[in-house]
């Protein structure tokens, strides 16, 4: 519990500096939507956005007609940015303040989206906890989309070391239950004008 609180405090402090100034900021979730489109995720599907925080993805999905959208983030402060941006529409989103490593899903989701959470898990124990949560929250046929730093991406982010992956390396980490079905690369431009290369993959759960 103490570790969860420390992590939450870290990310709350990060968001307190202003979302639009942070390296992860994006005005529109273009690559996320591109990957979801590429693998046939539609408005009829349920979707959970891991580490969604202040991301504009939830709003973009609502605009496309999605009606079963969940955002999970360890930082309540981060999600407040998205809530304020959405205004009354925020009530159409399920907001969960939790650490994905200790969260216990109570349902299945058709689509799992993670932009820049998994690459913070540099310990194998934490990756295994994450993958257990992923498996619990999905069933055969589900889609998982990941965006993580590429091999030539940053070695640290928000003061912490990160893992970097090629598409094949990232798919191997997710495991043999999941089949790699799409991949892409993004050159994310931060508010400071620097470039952060991202690896993107989409997988389908086989069993």
Annotated model-derived regions:
Residues 1-107, 121-137, 143-207:
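Class I (Rossmann-like) S-adenosyl-L-methionine-dependent methyltransferase catalytic domain
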Residues 113:
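A conserved beta-strand element that flanks and buttresses the S-adenosyl-L-methionine
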Residues 116-120:
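Short catalytic micro-motifs in class I SAM-dependent methyltransferases
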């Amino acid at each position: 519990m103490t570790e969860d609180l420390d992590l939450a405090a870290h990310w709350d402090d990060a968001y307190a500096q202003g979302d639009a100034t942070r390296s992860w900021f994006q005005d529109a979730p273009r690559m996320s939507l591109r990957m979801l489109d590429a693998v046939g995720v539609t408005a009829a599907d349920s979707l959970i956005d891991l580490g969604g925080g202040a991301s504009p993805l939830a709003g973009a999905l609502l605009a496309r007609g999605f009606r079963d959208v969940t955002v999970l983030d360890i930082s309540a402060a981060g999600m407040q940015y998205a809530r304020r941006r959405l205004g009354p529409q925020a009530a159409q989103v399920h907001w969960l303040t939790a650490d994905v490593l200790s969260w216990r899903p109570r349902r299945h989701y058709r689509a799992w989206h993670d932009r820049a959470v998994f690459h913070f898990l540099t310990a194998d124990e934490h990756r295994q906890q994450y993958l257990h949560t992923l498996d619990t929250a999905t069933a055969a046929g589900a889609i998982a989309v990941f965006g993580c730093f590429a091999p030539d991406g940053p070695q640290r982010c928000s003061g912490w070391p990160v893992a970097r992956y090629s598409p094949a390396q990232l798919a191997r980490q997710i495991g043999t239950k999941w089949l790699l079905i799409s991949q892409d690369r993004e050159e994310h431009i931060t508010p400071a004008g620097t470039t952060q290369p991202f690896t993107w993959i989409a997988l389908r759960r086989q069993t």
